[in-house]
Amino acid sequence: MMRGMGNMQSMMKQMKKMQAQMTAEQAALNEQTFTGAAPDDMVKVTFTGDKKMKDITINPDAVDPDDVDMLQDLVVAAVNDALTKVDEQTQSTMGKYTKGLQ
């Protein structure tokens, strides 16, 4: 009977340790920055790991008052590129904790 309690305590310790590691890795991931770019680097955006936009750079050549749609498309492309990078790194870093839980 006591042996089962020891195993339970050990398992709880391991779970707390894993939770602390997961929290630390998530915090580190949130501090990283990810830059996405539109074709020809006409627009670049930078996000943090928790998907907060930090910066946007627009090449002056991308600004054409007669073609606002192109600039909008470039911004969307850059944002999607950056967010894809965030998602890929998040999966790479945090996936080991969720493997088998899906």
UniProtKB/Swiss-Prot annotation:
GO cellular component terms, alphabetically, are:
bacterial nucleoid; cytosol
Report the locations given in the UniProt record: Cytoplasm, Nucleoid
Listed A to Z, the keywords are: Cytoplasm, DNA-binding
Q: Region Disordered: start and end of each range?
A: 1-24
A GO molecular-function annotation:
DNA binding
> Is Cytoplasm there in the keyword field?
yes
Task: Output the superkingdom of the source species.
Answer: Bacteria
Q: Tell me which InterPro entries the record gives.
A: YbaB-like_sf, YbaB/EbfC
Specify whether Cytoplasm is a keyword of the entry. Answer: yes
Q: Which family does it belong to?
A: Belongs to the YbaB/EbfC family.
- Protein purpose: Binds to DNA and alters its conformation. May be involved in regulation of gene expression, nucleoid organization and DNA protection.
Q: How does it assemble?
A: Homodimer.
Q: Which NCBIfam families match?
A: DNA_YbaB_EbfC (TIGR00103)
Please give the name of this protein. Nucleoid-associated protein lp_0699
